[in-house]
From Swiss-Prot:
It comes from Mus musculus. A motif ([ST]-Q motif 2) lies at residues 1102-1103. The lineage of its organism: Eukaryota, Metazoa, Chordata, Craniata, Vertebrata. Zn(2+) 2 binds at C132, S135, H154, C160. This is Regulator of nonsense transcripts 1. Found in a post-splicing messenger ribonucleoprotein (mRNP) complex. Associates with the exon junction complex (EJC). Associates with the SGM1C complex; is phosphorylated by the complex kinase component SGM1. Part of a complex composed of SMG1, DHX34 and UPF1; within the complex DHX34 acts as a scaffolding protein to facilitate SMG1 phosphorylation of UPF1. Interacts with UPF2. Interacts with UPF3A and UPF3B. Interacts with EST1A. Interacts with SLBP. Interacts (when hyperphosphorylated) with PNRC2. Interacts with AGO1 and AGO2. Interacts with GSPT2. Residues 178-208 are annotated as: C4.
Length: 1124
């Protein structure tokens, strides 16, 4: 079979799928998916080239089958009597005479392939394929249409690590393993060329390749290289198929590989054809921007919560570990504590620790089941709560047993641990969604409509504002904090954006203080994580308010800075209930109570809990903790959720449905968002926070503007890039010069530099993360130099985006650091994500990524870069490969900025010199009106979303009102037509570039200008009784028209655009978009509105029904202060 058969001269069309659908999702609204006709063409419409067409057997003349059929068709298009049988027979005969040539690609794969053919593409050259010992399947070393080879793709996705080469390959049937220790994890294996010719030695990265004993046998450990580079096995080990072979092979996309791997988990013998079966790949409904009512809201979010719950359960219940060795101890509360480490595997301890910490998110309070399976004692099972997780000091996990009865404390071996999955948090989210839908009293009418995205007139709460906004016991507030507190107290729904170091916690505590002083019952304060709740609880307590910290019962044994405020500890100290104290003392001493005493103890405890909660000024708990049964019968008028951008929307709803009439969301959508483990749920929108959606709906957050954390030189770049230059410095350069610290910065007045490192990335032992040994060595040298210069270990933080690098750094510091091991143990090494909300005096950032083809992964996420750059108070040092990083526009800006500041350096640390490396000129988001936004600024949404019909950024409406309060976007920071190619490149832009200005709120009954009351806009109410909210404030049906709409009669203009409302826009006619100062002809001729850009928009907005259709028409006539 000749190569030409597949070349340009062949008559066979071969269609190759690209990975674009994997990246952007299929364009189901595009023209190729349009409904045309799902029936066979009529005989009179037979296409050219078919039977009867110009190229068919009955062709050019009048004599084909179609022609003969036509002759017998009557005037009304009905076949005459007797003609049917003849025509069918003749057509069948003609079709039988046709010789259809089978596509060679099809025949290539319909014939029986050998057993060792690649399970993805079918390539079966013995030199090119590798056997996966775990899944019992063969894969080739070719990339096909994916970024890595098929074997590496499989190993990573299936979490397999052991392989065997083919017996007919150049190296024979060989299991790849370490020559020294027998480790078979291919992600750990590498080779050292031996002195003898044509001999290589396979050794694992750690510990074997780093042992000093290698020198004794003439092996140079510095020459060690991994077997897998650029996500492919080295070609001398496993041959890479030729380009022709790969073109002839079955074409499979990354998206299909993903689906096939998922299918193999359930059915190992599944094939690509099985993917086509109905129901195999059902995608959940995507979240919307607006919802008709709370039932639709529940019907969309409920399945996503279930998806995440199912994924979480499957992951945690699959992680059973045998052969555990336990160390027993007795806690201060007389409870048994079991200490254990995860067993050593071929990949070393790192692999399992990563899975338990990163994938399973093991944390204090989680439940673990410990079983004894040996012969030295009776079989036993006990449940305990985790009280210690692995850290820099060791990999030990500790659990406190609920009951010590029968615990085999005399034995230490042959134990098994299982993760006990609990559905509590997911059940509470589902319950909150249901409550929101069915319970009228769950939230006020105003908040109900706002959360669903309905148009509601803004209102102001009449309240007595304090004369002095600073709370007692807390620092004085700056101007932006005072404005935030003052505004929030007067509004039913507020968003506060707190960039890094701007005093978000102090501001939140001050708001809670003033809300509590109003005497409207306890204020509920929540956050997604226990650490964030504890920090805020501590600050609120400083104001002198009565604060109760409500903990999950599984966390009562865990110590925290605010343990004395915890409900269970406050009950212990209640002098008003002596009987309860006696029973508690008896329980502590004996460990158990009689059934009668236990019953009495629980009743008294419930009474005490209720009394403390009812009398508290403030109750603090996690968002999921707000679903605790102890709060079930309480109603909270005022609710504040801190770090709300790190919570999923259903998580936020758990506290919200406890009666919210005044809701304050605090967060920063320019930092990292919620963690969603299930990719399908994340892709459907569960990873978008409520805060973000409300911002897109046009509720403009109040931004805190003075930062008190960073040296001014450190805050300049994040301010310009992420916050449009709006951050002011509350500290001077002199405030951020450390006394007794002698470190030579390349620029003495700028405590920062980018240290150019040319090392290569490697896949970590888990197969799902990366590490960079050269960077790790440089990080150790920098850490040592900082310590010698006078920095204390606990003042230094090392952060990296990759768990593999974090784990490698911990081990490298211990074994290769030139100072005492204990010093390095006190240096915190963590992922960027784990450092959010934290700060250190000095931060070292290891970027890790350095490759030719793979890109830079989630370093691409601007929010991750923002978090990484804003953790330091006194100095930042970035270690990375500029060549790889500069390909991404945002990093290009960062590197160019460091070069401008003469802080891009290379060479030995004691003699740093400015790097001569040159970068292409950064692409700028040109904004002539607002020079402060000259950098490519960022947030969660990119330029394409500025034209989503239905969002606040929709520019489709004509005839903009002139009144400045009712414009749909800010004239000062509009996006000009010039940089619109940015949209096609996915370059993020800031919210403020398309954000509407904040209109003045209206008091109840206040008219908005001379046109007030001139019409009633269309409204949507989710449930009866929502027309009036619980303030007695006007619902959406009582909104008034702004004066700019006085000349338009709503009834006669059903599709006219209201002040801040969104109308229907056809994505097939982007030229209808309007911008101030830009006429229609100008815009319609602009190059970026060509087919390429249009198709990208269509792909991104494939959930077209989210924004268009009947709902868009309904919104078309709504007017008033719609977004606030």
């Amino acid at each position: 079979m000749s190569v030409e058969a597949y070349g340009p001269s062949s008559q066979t069309l071969t269609f190759l799928d690209t990975e674009e659908a994997e990246l952007l999702g299929a364009d189901t609204q595009g023209s190729e998916f349009e409904f045309t006709d799902f029936t066979l063409p009529s005989q009179t419409q037979t296409p050219p080239g078919g039977p009867g067409g110009a190229g068919g057997p009955g062709g050019a003349g009048a004599g084909g089958a179609a022609g003969q059929l036509d002759a017998q068709v009557g005037p009304e298009g009905i076949l005459q009597n007797g003609a049917v049988d003849d025509s069918v027979a003749k057509t069948s005969q003609l079709l039988a005479e046709l010789n259809f040539e089978e596509d060679e690609e099809d025949t290539y794969y319909t014939k029986d392939l050998p057993v060792h053919a690649c399970s993805y593409c079918g390539i079966h050259d013995p030199a090119c394929v590798v056997y996966c010992n775990t899944s019992k399947k063969w894969f080739c070393n070719g990339r096909g249409n994916t970024s890595g080879s098929h074997i590496v793709n499989h190993l990573v996705r299936a979490k397999c690590k052991e392989v065997t080469l083919h017996k007919d390959g150049p190296l024979g049937e060989t299991v790849l393993e370490c020559y020294n220790c027998g480790c078979r994890n291919v992600f750990l294996l590498g080779f050292i060329p031996a002195k003898a010719d044509s001999v290589v030695v396979l050794l694992c990265r750690q510990p074997c390749a780093s042992q000093s004993s290698l020198k004794d046998i003439n092996w140079d450990s510095s020459q060690w290289q991994p077997l897998i580079q650029d996500r492919c096995f080295l070609s001398w080990l496993v041959k890479i198929p030729s380009e022709q072979e790969q073109l002839r092979a079955r074409q499979i996309t990354a998206q299909q590989i993903n689906k096939l791997e998922e299918l193999w988990k359930e059915n190992p013998s599944a094939t690509l054809e099985d993917l086509e079966k109905p129901g195999v790949d059902e995608e959940p409904q995507h979240v919307l921007l607006r919802y008709e009512d709370a039932y639709q809201y529940q019907n969309i979010f409920g399945p996503l919560v279930k998806l995440e719950a199912d994924y979480d359960k499957k992951l945690k219940e699959s992680q059973t570990q045998d052969n555990i060795t336990v160390r027993w101890d007795l806690g201060l509360n007389k409870k048994r504590i079991a200490f254990f480490t995860l067993p050593k595997t071929d990949s070393g301890n790192e692999d399992l620790v990563i899975i338990w910490l990163r994938d399973m998110r093991l944390m204090q309070g989680d439940e673990i089941c410990l079983r004894y399976k040996g012969d030295l004692a009776p079989l036993w099972k006990g449940i305990g709560h985790v009280i210690k997780v692995p850290d820099n000091y060791g990999d030990e996990i500790a659990i406190e047993l609920r009951s010590s009865v029968g615990a085999p404390v005399e034995v230490t071996h042959n134990f098994q641990v299982d993760f006990v999955w609990k559905s509590t948090s997911f059940d509470r989210m589902q319950s909150a969604l249901k409550t929101f839908a069915v319970d009228e009293t769950s939230v006020s009418g105003y908040i109900y409509h706002k959360l669903l995205g309905h148009e509601v007139e803004d209102v102001v709460i009449k309240c007595q504002l304090p004369k002095r906004f600073t709370a007692q016991g807390l620092p004085d507030l700056n101007h932006s904090q005072v404005y935030a507190v003052k505004t929030v107290l007067q509004r039913p729904l507020s968003l506060i954006q707190g960039p890094p170091g701007t005093g978000k916690t102090v501001t939140s505590a001050t708001i809670v203080y003033h809300l509590a002083r109003q005497g409207n019952g306890p204020v509920l304060v929540c956050a997604p994580s226990n650490i964030a709740v504890d920090q805020l609880t501590e600050k609120i307590h400083q104001t002198g308010l009565k604060v109760v910290r409500l903990c999950a019962k599984s966390r009562e044994a865990i110590d925290s800075p605010v343990s004395f405020l915890a409900l269970h500890n406050q009950i212990r100290n209640m002098d008003s209930m002596p009987e309860l104290q006696k029973l508690q003392q008896l329980k502590d001493e004996t460990g158990e109570l009689s059934s009668a005493d236990e019953k009495r103890y629980r009743a008294l405890k419930r009474t005490a809990e209720r009394e403390l909660l009812m009398n508290a000024d403030v109750i603090c708990c996690t968002c999921v903790g707000a679903g605790d049964p102890r709060l079930a019968k309480m109603q909270f008028r005022s609710i504040l959720i801190d770090e709300s951008t790190q919570a999923t929307e259903p998580e936020c709803m758990v506290p919200v449905v406890l009666g919210a009439k005044q809701l304050i969301l605090v967060g920063d959508h320019c930092q990292l968002g919620p963690v969603v483990m299930c990719k399908k749920a994340a892709k459907a929108g569960l990873s978008q926070s409520l805060f973000e959606r409300l911002v897109v709906l046009g509720i403009r957050p109040i931004r805190l503007q003075v930062q008190y954390r960073m040296h001014p030189a450190l805050s300049a770049f994040p301010s310009n890039i992420f916050y449009e230059g709006s951050l002011q410095n509350g500290v001077t350069a002199a405030d951020r010069v450390k006394k007794g610290f002698d470190f030579q910065w390349p620029q003495p007045d700028k405590p920062m530099f980018f240290y150019v490192t040319q090392g290569q990335e490697e896949i970590a032992s888990s197969g799902t993360s990366y590490l960079n040994r050269t960077e790790a060595a440089n990080v150790e040298k920098i850490t040592t130099k900082l310590l010698k210069a006078g920095a204390k270990p606990d003042q230094i933080g090392i952060i990296t985006p990759y768990e593999g690098q974090r784990s490698y750094l911990v081990q490298y510091m211990q074994f290769s650091g030139s100072l005492h091991t204990k010093l390095y143990q006190e240096v915190e090494i963590a992922s960027v994500d784990a450092f959010q909300g934290r700060e250190k005096d000095f931060i070292i950032l290891s970027c890790v990524r350095a490759n030719e083809h793979q890109g830079i992964g989630f370093l691409n996420d601007p929010r991750r870069l923002n978090v990484a750059l804003t953790r330091a108070r006194y100095g930042v040092i970035i270690v990375g490969n500029p060549k790889a990083l500069s390909k991404q526009p945002l990093w290009n800006h960062l590197l160019s900025y460091y070069k401008e500041q003469k802080a891009l350096v290379e060479g030995p640390l004691n003699n740093l010199r400015e790097s001569l490396m040159q970068f292409s000129k950064p692409r700028k988001l040109v904004n002539t009106v607002n020079p402060g936004a000259r950098f490519m600024t960022t947030a969660m949404y990119d330029a394409r979303e500025a034209i989503i019909p239905g969002s606040v950024y929709d520019r489709s409406s004509q005839g903009r009102p002139s009144n400045m309060y009712f414009q749909t976007h800010d004239q000062i920071s509009m996006i000009s037509a010039g940089p619109s190619h940015v949209a096609a490149m996915n370059i993020p832009i800031p919210f403020n570039l398309v954000m509407p200005p904040m209109p003045p709120p209206g008091y109840f009954g206040q008219a908005n200008g001379p046109a007030a009351g001139r019409g009633t806009p269309k409204t949507k109410t989710g449930r009866g009784g929502r027309q009036k909210n619980r303030f007695g404030l006007p619902g959406p049906s009582q909104t008034t028209l702004p004066n700019s709409q006085a000349s338009q009669d709503v009834a006669s203009q059903p599709f006219s655009q209201g002040a801040l409302t969104q109308g229907y826009v056809s994505m097939s006619q982007p030229s209808q978009m309007s911008q101030p100062g830009l006429s229609q002809p100008e815009l319609s001729q602009d190059s970026y509105l060509g087919d390429e850009f249009k198709s990208q928009i269509d792909v991104a907005l494939s959930q077209d029904s989210t924004y268009q259709g009947e709902r868009a028409y309904q919104h078309g006539g709504v007017t008033g202060l719609s977004q606030y």
